[in-house]
């Protein structure tokens, strides 16, 4: 079906944080791709530190004034909603054709702005849905979905969840990876990072996301401990962990497991916790790792999987959606994420030279298929449904962007 050309749009993209999290990285890359397609996309995020986004953006980006907040997760989310409402309290601040929420926080702010008639409505991307026992958080999660004018998901899995649990239809837009930044080509910075982390000659395994239950870090630690019996020089790098939520209880369990297994933590030790990693160092971190171990229990898509594959690093993932949507057998090692023995066996298998070569080649092909400009083009029909009709018309997308716009699955 031929779609009408989309006019030049001013798009406000709102995410929950300036920290290096998958949803934030997605928002920035989407904004950059939309600008390359001729639109004006401005990415917003609450910024209590005043330091700006975790990386320099190649599109307009606004750090929304926000104050540090202590206490419960509900108190934090409520404060961040209020920060957004204060920022968009004037017609001048609301001078956009399309408002696009990437999270529950911004979805609730835009829902309130819609009810106040400061904006005509908004698009919401649901990356995943966090289960919560807090009634207020659950209410906010539901409102940010049901009050949206249009819904998007990265995967068919989450689109199906929205249909089943909320009776809501979502279009599937996928995601992308920056193939100019994430490449398999080594550089001198790789060895410098290796030295700074104290990595030796043994195999290096990488876990991304910090100590967080959703990332299944405890199972990774236990699997790594089992693997070290055959590879005593192996090291595990646990990167990231910048989260708005409190994971102290789960972190304590991870630390107890490390102590129980006799795994020392620190530079040059069996386990290295980096905390948030500078964006400039991430490609090197993927390249110096032998394997990305990512048996996550719940993901919207798994951006770090694509980044690792683009860098030529073999990947271990959970044998469940959304990974099964875009990874065929032989493109990654798939495991039952609740079976630490299976994770350890996959870590061992990932070191076999022949298998490594096949995984590297297949992974790079997967990454090449995830193009940000094509992902951005898949957003445009949804934007056009909510945008005013008097914007100047841009030429229709051509090439890969047009192909993907027409062929992305539209119903889930």
Regions from the language model: what does each represent?
Residues 4-7, 14-21, 28-82:
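N-terminal strand-loop element at the rim of the active site
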Residues 12, 199-215, 221-224, 237:
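Conserved donor-binding/catalytic core segment of Leloir-type glycosyltransferases
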Residues 101-106, 126:
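Short His-centered aromatic/hydrophobic patch
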Residues 145, 284-289:
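Short alpha-helical donor nucleotide-sugar binding micro-motif in glycosyltransferases
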Residues 251-280:
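Nucleotide-activated donor-binding/catalytic signature segment of Leloir-type glycosyltransferases, i.e.
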Residues 297:
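Aromatic "clamp/platform" in nucleotide-sugar-dependent glycosyltransferases that forms part
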Residues 305, 314-317:
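Short hydrophobic beta-strand element within catalytic cores of glycosyltransferases
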Residues 329-341, 349-354:
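Conserved acidic donor-binding segment of nucleotide-sugar-dependent glycosyltransferases
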């Amino acid at each position: 079906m031929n779609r009408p050309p989309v006019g030049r749009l001013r798009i406000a993209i709102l995410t929950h944080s300036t920290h290096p999290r998958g949803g934030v990285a997605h928002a920035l890359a989407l904004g950059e791709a939309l600008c390359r397609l001729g639109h004006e996309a401005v990415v917003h995020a609450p910024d209590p530190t005043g330091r700006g986004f975790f990386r320099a953006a190649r599109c307009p980006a606004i750090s929304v004034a926000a104050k540090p907040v202590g206490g419960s997760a509900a108190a934090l989310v409520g404060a961040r909603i209020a920060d957004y409402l204060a920022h968009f309290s004037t017609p001048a601040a609301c001078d956009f054709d399309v408002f696009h929420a990437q999270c529950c926080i911004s979805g609730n702010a835009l829902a309130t702005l819609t009810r106040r008639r400061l904006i005509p409505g908004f698009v919401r991307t649901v990356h995943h849905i966090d289960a919560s026992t807090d009634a207020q958080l659950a209410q906010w999660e539901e409102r940010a979905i049901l009050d949206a004018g249009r819904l998007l998901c990265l995967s068919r899995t989450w689109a199906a969840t929205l249909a089943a649990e909320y009776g809501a239809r979502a279009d599937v837009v996928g995601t992308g990876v920056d193939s100019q930044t994430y490449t398999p080509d080594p550089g001198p910075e790789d060895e410098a990072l290796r030295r700074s982390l104290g990595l030796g000659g043994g195999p290096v395994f990488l876990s991304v996301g910090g100590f967080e239950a959703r990332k299944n870090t405890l199972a990774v630690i236990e699997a790594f401990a089992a693997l070290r019996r055959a590879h005593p020089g192996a090291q595990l790098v646990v990167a990231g962990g910048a989260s708005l939520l409190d994971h102290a209880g789960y972190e304590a369990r991870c630390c107890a497991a490390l102590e129980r297994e006799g795994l020392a933590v620190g530079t040059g030790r069996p386990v290295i916790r980096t905390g948030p990693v500078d964006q400039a160092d991430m490609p090197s971190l993927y390249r110096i790792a032998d394997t990305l171990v990512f048996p996550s229990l719940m993901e919207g898509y798994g951006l770090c999987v694509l980044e690792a594959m683009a860098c030529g690093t073999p990947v271990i993932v959970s044998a469940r959606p959304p990974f099964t949507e875009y990874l065929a057998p032989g493109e990654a090692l798939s495991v039952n994420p609740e079976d630490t023995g299976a994770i350890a066996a996959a870590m061992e298998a990932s070191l076999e030279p022949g298998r490594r070569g096949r995984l590297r080649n297949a992974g790079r092909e997967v990454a090449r298929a995830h193009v940000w400009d094509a992902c951005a083009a898949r957003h445009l029909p949804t934007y056009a449904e909510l945008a005013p009709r008097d914007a100047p018309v841009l030429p229709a997308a051509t090439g890969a962007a047009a192909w993907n716009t027409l062929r992305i699955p539209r119903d889930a």
